[in-house]
Amino acid sequence: MDGGSGGPYTSRTAEEVFRDFRGRRAGMIKALTTDVEKFYQLCDPEKENLCLYGYPNETWEVTLPAEEVPPEIPEPALGINFARDGMNEKDWLALVAVHSDSWLLAVAFYFAARFGFDKEARRRLFNMINNLPTIFEVVTGAAKKQTKEKAPNSTNKPNKPSSKMQPRPESHSKAPKPPAPPKDDDESGDEYADEEEEERDNTLCGSCGTNDGKDEFWICCDSCERWYHGKCVKITPARAEHIKHYKCPDCGNKRARA
């Protein structure tokens, strides 16, 4: 994505900045997980200040920081290589992950500022970013742990939108967003219905980051357990009936690369 200290800026959307964020994030996760041995070797403490960069095309690089001042975009943490041999490897990787998360947010909202995002566009961008686990959560395994902890709380409430955090029966992932259960006469039933309504309103599409079209067809990814507008992932109700286990575009691409 273009962005620098000079020159005109063309209009960009929150979705475009999010795609840039997601690509950089994927590259950095790759460096700290599947390519970790190569990453470890490149971070030689005998070398100068090194940085971990993630790029929009889902690649990564360990290199020296940009020489230009001020830099074209915010720079990642300097000198990640210096602490490598003085820490436990897992702790060091977790530290790099934390700094990587901070850098990704800085870059995303740098673009948001330069492209003149208003309050609503910034909100959409943040919500889309916040739907993804942080690099730290992926590297330390906290993301999987959170999913497992949330699943038991939702097993008896299959209609709650928060069930996107747990595996759902096939019928739930192939149907429009489930309606809230009917209100009971007792007070506890009313509270539960209110909670259902609030959580349904807060459920965001994993692709466009909005909760528009509550009456439209939605589908849930059986891998990452996020909800999507059918139109955003090009899945119709008729086609969904023939899909046993649905994978969203992100999860499908990860499997192909693996």
Curated annotation (Swiss-Prot):
Amino acid composition bias (Polar residues), ranges on this chain: 152-165
Record Pfam families: Alfin (PF12165), PHD (PF00628)
BP GO terms, sorted: chromatin organization; regulation of DNA-templated transcription
CDD domains from the UniProt entry: PHD_AL_plant (cd15613)
Ranges annotated as PHD-type zinc finger: 202-254
Domain of life from the UniProt record: Eukaryota
InterPro entries in alphabetical order: Alfin, Alfin_N, PHD_AL_plant, Zinc_finger_PHD-type_CS, Znf_FYVE_PHD, Znf_PHD, Znf_PHD-finger, Znf_RING/FYVE/PHD
Record carries keyword Transcription regulation: yes
Region annotation (Disordered) ranges: 143-205
GO cellular component terms, A-Z: nucleus
UniProt remark on domains: The PHD-type zinc finger mediates the binding to H3K4me3.
Family classification: Belongs to the Alfin family.
Protein name in UniProt: PHD finger protein ALFIN-LIKE 5
